[in-house]
Amino acid sequence: MSHLCSLHITTTLSGIRVNKVLIDGGAAISLLPERMLRKVGKHPDDLVPTNIVVTDFSGTSTPARGLVTLTVKVGSSERNTVFVVVPSRASYNALLGRDWIHGVGAVPFAVH
């Protein structure tokens, strides 16, 4: 396997099994494509309003639809995580960013 391949896992989001979850240490926040909202048992009315604008790697900016908190379970680790919900056609079903990675202690964090 190439070291340049992305890391996709299968996890549980608020009790729902979800595959193609991307772990991305380059992302400051965790993202949930809007199309996944109902699949994890949530409704657009559950979103907390936000002024966050997400900018992707190409520089395109998209206003977030809102925030939703989901319980993320990976192995024996379980943590409530705030996801920024965005309109997206991404190939992943959820993205776990540095907020989640460091929150579960998956990678030690050091400021240089």
Which role fits each region the language model picked out?
Residues 1-10:
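Charged, flexible boundary elements
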Residues 17, 25, 29-112:
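Aspartic protease core domain of the pepsin/retropepsin superfamily
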